[in-house]
Each structure stands twice: as C-alpha cells, then as structure tokens.
Regions:
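Anionic ligand-binding catalytic core segments
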Residues: 1-20, 24-147
Length: 147
C-alpha cells in the first residue's frame, strides 16, 4: 500500500525520477526493519512552468501497469493506477479510496509544507509545484478516467 501511495504521489508531483532506489530500509535490532523516509524526490513542475519540459514528453521512472507498461506522465489513466494496485494485491475499491484520500489531503499538505518553507524559498519553484499538485489532485477528485 505504501508503495502504491508513493507512486501516486510521484505522479501528483510529476516526480519523474521517482524510482526503486528512493526506497530504503532501516535494519533494526532482532532482524526488524522499517522503511526510511523517501529522499531525492524532485518535481518537474518548475521545468514545465518555464517551458523547458513539455508535459507530453515527460516519462516517469517507474511505470504503471495496464495491458502494457505506462511511463508517459500525461497519458497515465485511472485504470492504470487500478491495474497496478491489483497487480500489487489489493482491491480496486481500496486503490480508489487511496487515490481519493490522497487527493483530498493535498491542500492541507500544501499548507503544511508552505508553512515550513523558509521565507526566501523561491516562488518560481514552490508555486508551480503547488499549482501542479492542486491540478492533479483535482483530476483525481473529479473522477476523471483520463488525466
């Protein structure tokens, strides 16, 4: 479930370099382990905003599953997320709930992150990321079959 949520958040962020190496484990005493926080997650929204990277050319590092693998960010569809969830062993109902919950929480997450940013943090970076997140989340909330 965490992996699915992460792929969804990578898509929301247009974090095109989100790949398996972003996932690490802490090895703890007595053969226990837990996931580390994600790291090296970079959004392409600032590059799209200044016209350096056309959305149609963006490919994600990890694909979604469908009849084939889907890497193109702008062509990822609701059904691809649902197929990926099914392949990971959980129901389309749960996947849909995760998508809706994540999208519904986007504004509050943006507010929290915005409050943590230093005042000198460049708006040319934060602005496009926040706007892009809101736009992608709205697509999920509206129930669009295609994005």
């Amino acid at each position: 479930e965490t992996f699915f949520k992460t792929q969804l958040v990578f898509w929301l962020l247009a974090a095109i370099d989100g790949h398996a190496k972003n996932f690490s484990l802490f090895i703890e005493p007595e053969s226990a382990y837990r996931m580390t926080p994600l790291y090296d997650v970079i959004s392409a929204f600032p590059l799209m905003a200044k016209g350096s990277l056309p959305p149609a050319r963006i490919k994600m590092a990890m694909s979604l599953k469908g009849r084939s693998r889907h890497y193109h960010w702008s062509r990822m569809l609701t059904r691809h997320f649902l197929s990926t969830a099914k392949a990971a062993g959980f129901s389309p109902k749960r996947a849909t709930a995760i998508m809706q919950e994540t999208a519904a929480n986007t504004d509050s997450v943006i507010e929290s992150v915005s409050a943590l940013l230093p005042t000198e943090f460049p708006d040319k970076v934060a602005g496009p990321i926040f706007a892009g997140l809101r736009e992608q989340a709205q697509k999920l909330l509206s129930g669009q079959k295609t994005f």
